Amino acid sequence: MNNSTNSDMSTDLSGPPQVVEHVMTEPDLTYQFGGRYPIAEVRPGQVLRTSTEDCFSGAVRTVDDLPSEVCQQFNPVTGPFLVPGAEPGDTLALHFVEIRPARDWGMSATFPHFGALTATHTTAMLHPPLPEIVWRYDIDTTAGVVRFQARRSTYTVELPLDPMLGTVGVAPAGGEVRASIVPDTHGGNLDTPELRAGTTLYLPVHVPGAMFSLGDGHARQGHGEVCGVAVETAMHVTVAVDVIKGVPTPCPRIETDHQLIAIGAARPLEDAYRISQRDLITWTAQLTGLDLVDAYQLVSQAGRAAPGNVCDPNYTMHAAIDTTALHGATGYHGTHQRLRDLAGRLRTDLCGAAAGTLR
């Protein structure tokens, strides 16, 4: 068996969790990955508690607040956070312990020239662009729902609350700076609904310290984010951090208790699909010892695929497989389970100093 995505150089996570509290303020927000000094340091094995803004920087609060009029930039992230000891060729592991709405409301919108079903600057059409319309959702954390209210009728419906982060990434390689809205191998605006609490995200380390940032909270999002905007809201986030030394990761990956997920980002959409499928097949072969062609066949029959977004500068696709099809194999020498165990030892008041309700 080829365990090239496993490592014996694991951080000792057996002791009491060490928590780093970082209360987010406006200067902590950035709209890029790379090219920025760290705002704080989080060591491998520590747990970060912080907050994030929504993609509108909190400026869209009512259905009358048009983003084109009240927003100067979009998609801020909190960071970057420096991880000492992380070096190019390593893998950064981020286990999301809690992703909790910081407001009791969220916002969504349609934009002219943005979204999967409208003309854009690269998809030229003769028809008029879609109108700019804003929807406000009530978020009920007690009931675990968000409430949709149609703008052009009295139709309402409650949808399950499913908090996630749309944008998480590290500094790109080669000194490059990428806008936070762009997903790629460094992570970024992945918009993958599976990036919820209880999952571990693996990212390649391109620069010393990794320099990770996170944000773009969604109270829920459908696969594909077809109109381009989820139920956007600020979040309180608790994340456990580790570094897998000497083990590279080609593109973002997610591990849950029951599945492995590879994420591809590209245009056209079929290339994002191919990237995600190739990585999942390669990962499957490494974890099981299967020949690549046998792994290809196994993933063809046991795998699943879904879009993350079909509206950003790069599209995202994810390829997933249940670990039961891999005889229970886990990635990165059990890092997900180790971080999950660490999270379980945290005290129950996960809010800590970063808690409260954002205005």
At which residue positions do the language-model features occur?
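N-terminal, Lys/Arg-enriched amphipathic/low-complexity engagement segments
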Residues: 8-69
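Short, structured beta-strand/loop micro-motifs enriched in basic residues and often containing a Trp
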Residues: 23-33, 70-78, 178-186
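Short, well-ordered loop/turn sites that connect or cap secondary structure elements
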Residues: 42, 83-86, 195
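A generic structural signal for residues embedded in beta-strands
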Residues: 50, 91-94, 203
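Short, Lys/Arg- and Gly-enriched loop/turn segments at beta-strand edges
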Residues: 55-66, 99-109, 209-219, 308-310
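Intrinsically disordered, low-complexity linker/loop segments enriched in Gly/Pro
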Residues: 101-196
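Conserved mixed alpha/beta catalytic, RNA-binding, or beta-rich assembly cores of soluble enzyme
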Residues: 161-270, 281
